Amino acid sequence: MRSLPNVLAIVLAGGEGKRLFPLTEDRAKPAVPFGGSYRLIDFVLSNLVNAGFLKIAVLTQYKSHSLDRHISQAWNLSGPTPQYIASVPAQQRRGKRWYNGSADAILQSLNLIYDEKPDYVIVFGADHVYRMDPAQMVEEHIATGLDCSVAGIRVPRSEASAFGCIQADGMGTITEFVEKPENPPATPDDPNMTYASMGNYVFTTQALIDALLEDEKNEDSAHDMGGNIIPYFVEREQAHVYDFMANEVPGSTERDHGYWRDVGTIDSFYEAHMDMISVHPIFNLYNRSWPIHSTDDSNFPPAKFVQNGIAQSSMVAPGCIVSGGTVRNSVLASDVHVADGATVEGSVILPGVRIGRGAVVRHAILDKNVVVSDGAIIGVDRERDEERFKVSEGGVVVVGKNVKV
C-alpha cells in the first residue's frame, strides 16, 4: 500500500447550477441524481476515497438539504479512526456574509486547514463526471516543488473557448491562465489541442493560505479560484499543469481512459447519460477496480420486468417495475414504474417517476416523482412541449420535480 502525504481535501459544492434548471430548482447542483443510482457529488467523493484521502470537507451553501442528507447517509465514515467526510455550510467566520465566490468559501473555512495542519490541500469541484486517481496528481505536485498544480484536460482548440484555458511551457509550468479565450493557447506538444482547466487543484498549504489572505484584501477581486487565485500563482511562476491523460485509473479501458464531462447544462447532462448505455460505453460504471460509491438504492429490491415488459440498451436501477412497457436507450433511476403499453425511449428518468398506460416519453429528462398520466405524450411535438416544459437547445424536454403531466 502506497504511503500518502498529509492531505486535506476540500470539495466545492455550493454551486447553484442555474444552467441545469429546473433540475436545480430545489437542490444544489452536486445533489442532482445521475446515472440511475448516484448523485453528481458521488464521483468526486469516490475518486478521493478510492485514492485513500479520507479527510474531506464538503463546502455547501445553495439549497443544500438533500446534499447534506446524502453525505450523512451515503458517506458516513464513522469509526475510531480520524477520518471523515463532513458537510460544512458557510460559517460567517470573517463577517456576516455567505460565501462570495469559491476562494471566499475556502477563506471562510481556513479554520479547517488550521485544525488539520495538512502539508497539502486538494481543492476539487463537485459536479463533474469522471474517474481520477488524485494521489497521482499530488505525487506530481510534490515532485515539481511548486506551490500550485492545476489539472488540465486536453480538448481541441476549436472547442476550448468554453473553458478556462492553460498555456504552459515544455516543463509544465503555467505561463498564462485565461478564462474562455477567443484564441485558446496550444499545448506544448500539439498545436491543435489546448489544456482546459478541470477545476481540480493541489496546493502547498501555506502558499494557499497566503494567496487567500492576499486576495481578501483586494476589493476588486471576484474571490474566485480560477479567476483570481490561480492567476496569483501563475504570476509568481508557481503553477504547474497536471495532464489528466497521464492519470492511470485501475480497471480503465482504452475507450474510457481520460473521460471527463462537465454536466453543467441540460444537453451535457443528457449526453453524459447516453455515454453510459452502449455495449462498450464511453464511460463505464462497471469498473469494480475503481468503483463509484453510493447507497441511495440500498433499501430497494431488484428491478422487475413483468407482462412482457422489456428494457433494451438501458440501465435500470433497483426498485423499478416495467410492467408491459418498453424501455429503450434510457436510464431509469430507482423506484420508477412503467405501465402496460408505455414507451420510454432515449430518456433519463429520475427516482420515483410513474409512467402510465400507453404513455410515450422520448428524448426527455423527468425529475423526481413526476407522474405521466395514461396516454400522455412527451418529446414528440416540440411546439407543444415548449408550451408546457423547458426544452433545451438540443431538443431535450425537461419536466420538473413533482409535476403531473
Curated annotation (Swiss-Prot):
GO biological process terms held by the UniProt record: glycogen biosynthetic process
UniProt KW keywords: ATP-binding, Carbohydrate metabolism, Glycogen biosynthesis, Glycogen metabolism, Nucleotide-binding, Nucleotidyltransferase, Transferase
PROSITE patterns, A to Z: ADP_GLC_PYROPHOSPH_1, ADP_GLC_PYROPHOSPH_2, ADP_GLC_PYROPHOSPH_3
Residues where alpha-D-glucose 1-phosphate binds: Y99, G164, E179, K180, S197
Pfam families, sorted: Hexapep_GlmU, NTP_transferase
Pathway: Glycan biosynthesis; glycogen biosynthesis
GO molecular function, one term: ATP binding
EC category: transferase
Catalytic activity: alpha-D-glucose 1-phosphate + ATP + H(+) = ADP-alpha-D-glucose + diphosphate
EC number(s) reported in the record: 2.7.7.27
InterPro entries: ADP-Glc_PPase, ADP_Glu_pyroP_CS, GlgC_bac, GlmU/GlgC-like_hexapep, NTP_transferase_dom, Nucleotide-diphossugar_trans, Trimer_LpxA-like_sf
Functional summary from the UniProt entry: Involved in the biosynthesis of ADP-glucose, a building block required for the elongation reactions to produce glycogen. Catalyzes the reaction between ATP and alpha-D-glucose 1-phosphate (G1P) to produce pyrophosphate and ADP-Glc.
Family, similarity comment: Belongs to the bacterial/plant glucose-1-phosphate adenylyltransferase family.
Subunit structure: Homotetramer.
Protein name, entry field: Glucose-1-phosphate adenylyltransferase
